[in-house]
Amino acid sequence: MPRKGPAPK
């Protein structure tokens, strides 16, 4: 399932 929060850089 998709994670919540900003995409990791």
Curated annotation (Swiss-Prot):
GO molecular function, one term: tRNA binding
Keywords assigned by UniProt, alphabetized: Ribonucleoprotein, Ribosomal protein, RNA-binding, rRNA-binding, tRNA-binding
This protein's GO CC annotations: ribonucleoprotein complex; ribosome
Origin superkingdom: Bacteria
Subunit structure: Part of the 30S ribosomal subunit. Contacts proteins S9 and S11.
Function recorded in the entry: One of the primary rRNA binding proteins, it binds directly to 16S rRNA where it nucleates assembly of the head domain of the 30S subunit. Is located at the subunit interface close to the decoding center, probably blocks exit of the E-site tRNA.
Protein name as annotated: Small ribosomal subunit protein uS7
Organism: Mycobacterium intracellulare
